[in-house]
A protein has these predicted regions:
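Metallo-beta-lactamase
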Residues: 1-103, 110-122
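Conserved nucleotide-sugar donor-interacting segment of glycosyltransferase catalytic cores
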Residues: 125
Length: 125
């Protein structure tokens, strides 16, 4: 688990899942220039891109922010046991997100503020 300190504030990344995106790289990035993309294979493969399946490897995670006064959860990921057949990666998800949150030292009842960067289904669990 990664944690950064910014003054007296700590920021911890809480992983929900990391893996291949549901669509090919060109679908995720419609203006993708393949020649320019392939130049970056040395650092992208295998942790950020799967060339055999043409899938970007993406991460879904929350940020646990502790200010000393407040405990803030930024984005709540996709969430478990949701009907999302149009998004196979998130359909009926079953991951130990709450265990990871507790491992970082916060239970759901410890959160003072929940913030969502935007309201896509992978951010509002």
């Amino acid at each position: 688990m990664q944690t950064w300190s910014i003054g007296s504030t700590t920021v911890t990344r809480i992983e929900e899942q990391i893996g291949p995106n549901d669509m090919p790289a060109g679908g995720f990035l419609p203006k993708l220039d393949r020649a320019r993309f392939e130049v970056h294979y040395p650092w992208m493969v295998p942790t950020h891109y799967d060339p055999a399946n043409d899938k970007l490897i993406t991460s879904n995670h929350s940020w646990l922010i502790r200010t000393g006064t407040h405990t803030i959860l930024l984005d709540t990921c996709a969430g478990n046991h949701k009907e999302r057949p149009w998004l196979p990666r998130f359909h009926q998800l079953d991951v130990p997100f709450l265990s990871r949150l507790r491992e970082a030292g916060a239970a759901p009842e410890d959160i003072d503020i929940v913030m969502c960067t935007h309201l896509h289904s992978d951010h509002v669990g």
